[in-house]
Amino acid sequence: GLCALLSALAKQPIYQHLAVTGAVDQFGNVQPVGGLNEKIEGFFRVCSIQGLNGKQGVVIPESNQLQLILSDEVIEAVKNGQFHIYPVSHVEEAVELLMGCPAGSIDDDQTLFGRIRERLDDLNGSAGRNGLFSTLFRRLHSLVGLA
């Protein structure tokens, strides 16, 4: 949900060859989830049916790595570079993988957070940096330690 929201706010599409799972706390830390093996195996099966192209993969919580017990078929595909498993510990890492754009700084329009700030300024009708949405986003950004 969070990555979809960030994508919509920034007007930055999410790659469709990657699946993502995990929970995120209020500071952007990615938390472990259950059923990870089944989620990976399920997405792998879908990708296999459509044809593995070396781009497909799953973004998972880093803290779940030790619980992975995957089929030999998935392990072989990962070893051969046909399927990928990307462990992440923070939402900023996931954003870069999923959108090909660094999360970055709200002051840099070439980053996801900069694009979001710019979009919120536009929605607020404020070309400046003192608009309501921009101010709220800056405060939220600094509160969660992303600044």
Residue ranges and their predicted role:
Residues 1-147:
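Peripheral, non-AAA+ core regions of ATP-driven protein-machinery
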